[in-house]
Structure formats: structure tokens, C-alpha cells
């Protein structure tokens, strides 16, 4: 599904991504973790060209995403992206937030778009809020609407960039449950997150990043029980609860 071939990215003299050579399989749930400033968010944003790379090659579903003549808007319409901030259109209702893009970019009729949106809002537990405005929702509810809005385009790939980091602690669980349900449905997902419990329970693989490199790639079982790289060992030691369970 996604291949990184010797990908490099710089911010001035800072080497933000250093020689990334990795692959994400179709249907895989990948969690990317690591300390702040490790390159996690930069990496995920290169997948739909929100961040430009300095060198290397990225392919998504066999498409070189830097190929000349690529219709970037059309390409991005096939990738769902959920950010730290919810980025809902404040002047549109929940339902209209979820129907706008399918009508404009997929050619759905208003009725078709609403039927799809209402089914997705039901899936994330918010069908009863379809007529509400974003300002009337909690942070967790807004993020669930953002997920439903992304899914309304029926993307084969979903990207999550720390989707719970801006939420109050009591709202995190409701968003993670929606993500768990997506993972169980076979969606290809790349998730940048500090939610290690989610990584342990849901991910097929974990990448650990530091200083712009993927230092470790492993199953959750191996990563949490038997981390190989010293930096990964230190990271897990720093985030473990007093009871020795990943936070």
C-alpha cells in the first residue's frame, strides 16, 4: 500500500527524516511512536504530500506521489486524514460537514451523500447530532465527526496524526474506540499516537522513531515485551505506569 524508498526531509540544516526505507501493507494497522521531535508527524504528512521531501520516493497503491502530472487533489481525496485539531467547518452542521466533499468530489446527490453520512454518524455514535453545529459538541464528539467526515469519501487508507492529543482525558476513550472498530474492519491505518494501550491492543506493527529514523519495527508483543534498540527501551521505561503496564 505505502512504500518509502530512501526518503529524506530537511528543515534548514535539520535532518527531519533520514533515509526512510519502509513498507506498509494493505489492511495493516501501523502505529508510529517515539519522543516529541522524532519525525513521526513529518513522516505521516509526507504520505499525502502535506510535507515535501528532499529526496527519495514514496508510492501509495503503486502510484509515485511525486510523479509529474499527478492530480494532487484527486490523489488526496482517496486518503482520509484526521489531525490533532478537528478542523470541522464551523458554519456547517455535522451532517453538512460530512456531505460536502462526497457531493463535490465524488458526484453524489444530496440524498446519497446524506444517507452515507448518517450511516457513518451512526457508526461513530453521533447520528443524533447530525443537525448540531460543531460548537455545540465536545472535543471527543468533534473528533468522531472528523473521522466520519473522512470516511464519507470511502478512502482505502486512513492517516491519524495524534488524534487524541488535543482532547481532555475522559474523551480519549470514545475516539480510540472508533479507531479500534475501524481497525477490526480491515481498514489500512497509519496512526501517530502516544496511546500505547491502543498500540498494544490494536496495531499489527509498531515503528519506533527517533531523530528522523525508524529505529525499531516490531509486532506490539515484541515491541513492548522485548524492545531491541536501547533508545526504544528507554522510551518505554519513561512512559510505563508505576504498575509496569504501558500507558
Q: Could you tell me what each predicted segment is?
A:
Residues 1-220:
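ABC family nucleotide-binding domain
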Residues 217, 221-247:
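C-terminal boundary and immediately downstream tail of ABC-type ATPase nucleotide-binding domains
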Amino acid at each position: 500500500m505505502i512504500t518509502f524508498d530512501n526518503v529524506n526531509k530537511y528543515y534548514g540544516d535539520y535532518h527531519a527524516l533520514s533515509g526512510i526505507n519502509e513498507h506498509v501493507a494493505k489492511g495493516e494497522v501501523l502505529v508510529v511512536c517515539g519522543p516529541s521531535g522524532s519525525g513521526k508527524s513529518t513522516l505521516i504528512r509526507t504520505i499525502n504530500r502535506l510535507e515535501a521531501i528532499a529526496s527519495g520516493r514514496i508510492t501509495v497503491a503503486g502510484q509515485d506521489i511525486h510523479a509529474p502530472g499527478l492530480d494532487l487533489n484527486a490523489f488526496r481525496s482517496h486518503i482520509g486524514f484526521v489531525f490533532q485539531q478537528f478542523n470541522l467547518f464551523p458554519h456547517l452542521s455535522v451532517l453538512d460537514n460530512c456531505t460536502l466533499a462526497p457531493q463535490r468530489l465524488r458526484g453524489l446527490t444530496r440524498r446519497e451523500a446524506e444517507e452515507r453520512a448518517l450511516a457513518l454518524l451512526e457508526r461513530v455514535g453521533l447520528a443524533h447530532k447530525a443537525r448540531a453545529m460543531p460548537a455545540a459538541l465536545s472535543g471527543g464528539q468533534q473528533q468522531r465527526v472528523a473521522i466520519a467526515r473522512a470516511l464519507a469519501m470511502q478512502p482505502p487508507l486512513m492517516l491519524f496524526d495524534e488524534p487524541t492529543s488535543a482532547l481532555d482525558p475522559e474523551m480519549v476513550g470514545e475516539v480510540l474506540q472508533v479507531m479500534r472498530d475501524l481497525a477490526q474492519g480491515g481498514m489500512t491505518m497509519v496512526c501517530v499516537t502516544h496511546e500505547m494501550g491502543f498500540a498494544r491492543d490494536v496495531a499489527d506493527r509498531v515503528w519506533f522513531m527517533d531523530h528522523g529514523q525508524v529505529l525499531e519495527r516490531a509486532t506490539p508483543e515484541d515491541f513492548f515485551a522485548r524492545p531491541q534498540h536501547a533508545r526504544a527501551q528507554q522510551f518505554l521505561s519513561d512512559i510505563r505506569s508505576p504498575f509496569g503496564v504501558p500507558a
